[in-house]
Design a protein with these regions (language model features):
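N-terminal low-structure segments adjacent to metalloprotease catalytic domains
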Residues: 1-15, 220-224
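Catalytic Zn2+-binding segment of zinc metalloproteases
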Residues: 106-127
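Short pre-active-site segment immediately N-terminal to the catalytic Zn-binding motif
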Residues: 69-70, 78-106, 159-164
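Acidic/histidine-rich, surface-exposed loop or edge segments in extracytoplasmic proteins
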Residues: 9-27
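Metalloprotease/metallohydrolase-associated module, dominated by Zn2+-dependent proteases
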Residues: 36-37, 42, 49, 75, ...
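Auxiliary, metal-adjacent structural segments of Zn-dependent hydrolase domains
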Residues: 25-77
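Short, solvent-exposed loop/turn segments at secondary-structure junctions
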Residues: 59-63, 78, 84-86, 108, ...
């Protein structure tokens, strides 16, 4: 009986201690870039970015990334849908090659932000223009088409444009094509996106010529 009383007393003390000194629940909501992800980005942006300031964030922004399944990068942080945040701990070793060029597509928005561009304003501007509601089909889009804000015709009507003449989403798409065509050629090379990237890589290189020479140049930021 005495041991039972002692046991009950210990339990009460443990409960009191827990109430007075609660252990905070650690919830994984954001992370830094991994060394592998930084190496990926340096192939494109060189030392134009402060990589230590970049975060990968779980959800946020009123839950829009999780509801839509799309990443959003309004202020230098990449907000992923909840499930993708939990599943992809390092984009540089992601099993799905699509995830790699998805990540690279978002990094130009980090670049735009760090060089002083207001991505939120550009996003609202594209939304008002119907850029995220109208699907368009061109030679650069997937067979299912793409939202108007992202659409390019790099081997046709857009071939002679400078990089700063593309909107902020198109800039992300162009760099995405460059990365897939130039750095993912040994990863499932028969993918539709890769084949398209290879086909237009000469046009992409011409459009990116100033960016590839000096990615720190603020004159390359989108003017539309």
């Amino acid at each position: 009986m005495g041991s039972v009383v002692i046991g009950v007393a210990k339990m009460r003390k443990m409960r009191a201690d827990a109430a007075n000194n609660p252990t905070p629940l650690q919830v994984d909501v954001e992370r830094l870039l991994t060394s592998g992800e930084i190496a990926m980005c340096q192939q494109i942006f060189k030392n134009a970015l402060n990589y230590s300031k970049v975060r990968i964030v779980r959800g946020g922004i009123l839950g829009i990334p999780t509801l839509t399944g799309n990443a959003m990068t309004p202020a230098g942080y990449i907000h992923l849908p909840n499930q993708e945040y939990l599943n992809i701990k390092d984009f540089s070793i992601a099993k799905n090659t699509t995830d790699k060029h998805w990540f690279i597509h978002e990094m130009p928005h980090v670049w735009q932000y760090q060089l002083g561009e207001n991505a939120v304003w550009h996003g609202i501007n594209q939304l008002c223009k119907g850029g995220y509601g109208t699907t368009v089909l061109t030679v650069d889009t997937p067979k299912s088409g793409d939202y108007k804000a992202y659409v390019t015709d790099l081997s046709g009507a857009d071939a002679n444009k400078k990089f700063n003449e593309f909107n902020f989403e198109q800039q992300g798409r162009i760099i995405e094509f460059w990365y897939d065509g130039g750095y993912l050629q040994h990863e499932n090379p028969y993918r539709e996106h890769h084949q398209k990237s290879i086909k237009i890589i000469g046009y992409v290189e011409y459009i990116l010529r100033d960016f590839l020479h000096n990615p720190k140049d603020k004159n390359l930021l989108p003017k539309v």
